[in-house]
Amino acid sequence: MENLPFPLKLLSASSLNAPSSTPWVLDIFLTLVFALGFFFLLLPYLSYFHCDDPPSPSPGKRKCPVGRRRRPRGRMKNHSLRAGRECPRGLEETSDLLSQLQSLLGPHLDKGDFGQLSGPDPPGEVGERAPDGASQSSHEPMEDAAPILSPLASPDPQAKHPQDLASTPSPGPMTTSVSSLSASQPPEPSLPLEHPSPEPPALFPHPPHTPDPLACSPPPPKGFTAPPLRDSTLITPSHCDSVALPLGTVPQSLSPHEDLVASVPAISGLGGSNSHVSASSRWQETARTSCAFNSSVQQDPLSRHPPETCQMEAGSLFLLSSDGQNVVGIQVTETAKVNIWEEKENVGSFTNQMTPEKHLNSLGNLAKSLDAEQDTTNPKPFWNMGENSKQLPGPQKCSDPRLLQESFWKNYSQLFWGLPSLHSESLVANAWVTDRSYTLQSPPFLFNEMSNVCPIQRETTMSPLLFQAQPLSHRQPFISSTPQFLPTPMAQAEAQAHLQSSFPVLSPAFPSLIKNTGVACPASQNKVQALSLPETQHPEWPLLRKQLEGRLALPSRVQKSQDVFSVSTPNLPQESLTSILPENFPVSPELRRQLEQHIKKWIIQHWGNLGRIQESLDLMQLRDESPGTSQAKGKPSPWQSSTSTGESSKEAQKVKFQLERDLCPHLGQILGETPQNLSRDMKSFPRKVLGVTSEESERNLRKPLRSDSGSDLLRCTERTHIENILKAHMGRNLGQTNEGLIPVRVRRSWLAVNQALPVSNTHVKTSNLAAPKSGKACVNTAQVLSFLEPCTQQGLGAHIVRFWAKHRWGLPLRVLKPIQCFKLEKVSSLSLTQLAGPSSATCESGAGSEVEVDMFLRKPPMASLRKQVLTKASDHMPESLLASSPAWKQFQRAPRGIPSWNDHGPLKPPPAGQEGRWPSKPLTYSLTGSTQQSRSLGAQSSKAGETREAVPQCRVPLETCMLANLQATSEDVHGFEAPGTSKSSLHPRVSVSQDPRKLCLMEEVVSEFEPGMATKSETQPQVCAAVVLLPDGQASVVPHASENLVSQVPQGHLQSMPTGNMRASQELHDLMAARRSKLVQEEPRNPNCQGSCKSQRPMFPPIHKSEKSRKPNLEKHEERLEGLRTPQLTPVRKTEDTHQDEGVQLLPSKKQPPSVSHFGENIKQFFQWIFSKKKSKPAPVTAESQKTVKNRSCVYSSSAEAQGLMTAVGQMLDKKMSLCHAHHASKVNQHKQKFQAPVCGFPCNHRHLFYSEHGRILSYAASSQQATLKSQGCPNRDRQIRNQQPLKSVRCNNEQWGLRHPQILHPKKAVSPVSPPQHWPKTSGASSHHHHCPRHCLLWEGI
């Protein structure tokens, strides 16, 4: 390249050293300086011209000015006009000068001064050949040319000697930064980057630009180096970081017109237009943009443009002689070949610039330099061009570019999708292409699956894909924005080793490498000298390696077992490792050593996988061949793994490295088979006693692994590990198992670890374990779960028996409990007709029925537990604490019919003599011991037991507390009893606990259907206890307890209530009425009682708040009496009707139908509203107006405002209670006269108690009349108006009676620790006019 052909030397010497060149160059410089100075003088005045001015011959007036200044005023106007006239004249003179210069240059060039590479060009042609995107209008303003011409004025020493500048080319090497415009440029002649003429670059330095090499053809390589001329130097201002090119830099094939345009672009522009001056500035901007993408567009190779074409086009230069044209053609051809390789070298340098660590140097010397005589079968890479850049490469045998391009994009897309560990294999599998694999298509890699198709054909001679020069030139434009992502050989080897260790299925891409050990190490592991980017370019690679080295893809138990495998490495033949890597494999010794280490590591890992597969195979063989070898009766069977023979080893060899074919069938057999016999499968499963010492386990782990017994040790370690996991798991879950959890979870975890039995069959197996008898269940548990410890087996067997018993007895008990409840109701209703019978008969019949029920339901003996409850109750333990205690919970759970169990015996019902029940003596306890009282108790106990459905929590504490406190309060009760009434006063209280078997049974039924009621009743335990515990001063708890309970009683139960229940409830009603009156009278003067009410507010917040918010002032009682008299008639009737239910359901029952949950809440709200209304009631009537009260019942039932008030209360209450009272209307009328005798024995006014009894009877009559009017729908308003005056008089009399008996307001204060609930209405002590309470008033007795 440094030696020029002889004819070219002579031509350049004769033309450039002519003495006549110096004067005209000086003339050009002077002319340009003059024109530039004149332009600067006119430039301020040119900015005032507008674009809409009429066109003038001067080209400077057609361009809109860049900026606009203020129009001068005064003197500046005339000056501007004068300058405007002179400007076109000056421009014309400048154009004439330029045309003269051009005319002078034309003949001078024709003489041969610049005949070698340049020549004149007419101004018109220059304007025509200017590119569309790079030129402006021919009338460009002169200001655009100013920054281009300014460097000419600098006192450059070489600028002063243009002859030397034009005649001495630099002999130095070419230092170029290759750049090109985008391929989308139109194929028009453009300004070249590397000018052939030495002079124009000095005058008008243009940015580097690659011209269009072939007319109407794709762009060629960026440029080539022509023979440098002698003693030529060039100083070119640098634009866009481009290095100055020598004067000999010539495009590889320039058309004649392009050459001429490139020679004098600016001078010719000055002659006709300023287009090229402006074009040069635009080329500078375009060149700056193209420098940023200097490698984004690659040129077509030389093969697309044969040398003949280039030579013909180069020879078409009309300025050269025939000899010169031939020389130029030859030089262009040779230089184009060299530039092709230099271009590819520059591509490598660009990649070098993109990678800080110089990835080409990190890979070492990838290939040798090019050799012109190299063999075609052994192509050499093109990277290291610096050593022998003069040598040209020979033709290479490359793969099909289309195939390589498609495979590259497939692999390139896989780099960012799927598993990262598969990238190296997918890339390298296509990176080694053989000579005869051009038409072979590489299938896409399947992630999460293993492809059985060989991607390439393995041949003895492999040529790296990346060593091919031709495909790179085709692929580079597509990947210029994204650098290639190819792993280094070491990284690929690691990724491949971990990939194979993570996935037991191997691709049979290289079956020839599978030898004795069966290790398939494809050639992709031995990738060498491949173009890749370091980890700094791709920060995800270090993380990838860490993840792969951390064995994230391996299961946890496989990772744990790898430590065992690393202890005892298999004795692998050394020739197997050497056979993996060929001797002539082009890798360094260090890289070979690292690859061998990774291969060994892979073999060790996969050896463990093979052992596990062989273990599963041996397990299936043991199931089929030796089903009866294990011992039964709870003893662990011996370890069966030692029975493996040489035949199984041969099977292991067959399966060893064919996992892609064997894994799926074996997994299907292991996970898909359903064993026919559970005991047979479990016997055949290898097991071991969990009491193995750590020394024995360690000794087994450190046993040397032999080639023939390697699978035995693997099975031993694996099974030991499984047993340890199971032992720890059972230890953690043993407490949960004892608490009642299903053991299926334990079985499922065991089966999941073993992977020997399907999880879906665990339920069937558990049902087999749960035998009908505990003895068989224990045996089966020991046989199946013999690997567990004896204590664990025993606990598991007991739990299975309990679980089986619970499920066996659950459904029958739920069905039988309601049936027994109905039977007991019938028996109790029959006992109501036998009031004259002895009390012992009732007790005996109750005891007999209880024994019968217990025998039927198999109730476990709970006598000791009930004694414990009685003991706690005798100590006055609060019922809320008792209900929350474990003993109380167990007592509630006990009568549910779960049969007693025994870990070593069958289930047996408890004997009749041991049935836990309440003693008959406390049940029939009476203070007086009279026969009538016992009969009353027997009658009331059945009905009270029947009504236990309402509140579930008052079952045992109510009974126990009553029994514990009867004796303590008997003397106090006698002190308050009136003569003749002491016997009947305590009848309802003692009758509460008369029939405990029915109460317990009803509680069980309630607990089955309404578990939510327990929460509501837990907040009211003391109220329930107060019903039966407090016989005197604190007896006021009874009405409120009944009120709370009545609000939860289902109305459907009231409809089906027999007549005997009503009788019993009416007797209870008498006692409640008397105690309500006493409570109200004593409450205003009892501050302690009021304090206790305040202290108990948290227990009853809703009712108390409702009463407190609606409590009227005592001063407004009379006004409310007149305003609420008529509307209150219906509430009285309704509350009286409700009191009928209250008498029936005085005590809480433990059973409610499912409809109670929503209906009970409505009832409760209704009574809250009633309580607020009760406070505003006037004084009650006295007993002297009994006849008036009887007549008043008709008035109440015929009230017209009753229906309106019922609408306010709620539609639910209207429907339920109307139906209930309509059903019992006739029965109440029949028994109305039987209960007029006084039953309350209190030292208060006897007339008041007698009046209360008649009030109760009045409530029944009112309910019956209400039902009748409800059905008829025609209220009698006239009767109501006619009877309003008697009602008023009765109330006034009752107020006077309340004032005559203030002594009743003083109760005993320390009778019971239970204080009245907070929701009792309080009457102000300051008011002495109204000391009554609506609770003992006739109008509110039904509450």
Curated annotation (Swiss-Prot):
Superkingdom of the source species: Eukaryota
Compartment list: Membrane
Biased composition (Pro residues): 198-222
Biased composition (Polar residues): 165-178, 627-647, 923-944
CC terms in the record's Gene Ontology section: membrane
Protein family (similarity comment): Belongs to the SPATA31 family.
PANTHER family: ACROSOME-SPECIFIC PROTEIN (PTHR21859), SPERMATOGENESIS-ASSOCIATED PROTEIN 31A1-RELATED (PTHR21859:SF55)
Recorded name of the encoding gene: SPATA31A6
Membrane-crossing residue ranges in chain numbering: 23-43
Statement: the UniProt record of this protein carries the keyword Membrane: yes
Biased composition (Basic residues): 60-82
Keywords: Differentiation, Membrane, Spermatogenesis, Transmembrane, Transmembrane helix
Region (Disordered): 55-88, 106-235, 624-654, 895-951, 1080-1156, 1309-1331
Topology with respect to the bilayer: Single-pass membrane protein
Entries under InterPro entries matching the protein: SPATA31 (IPR039509), SPATA31F3-like (IPR027970)
Organism encoding this protein: Homo sapiens (Human)
Protein name: Spermatogenesis-associated protein 31A6
Start-end of Basic and acidic residues biased regions: 1104-1123, 1133-1142
One Pfam family hit: DUF4599
One GO-annotated biological process of the protein: spermatogenesis
Role description: May play a role in spermatogenesis.
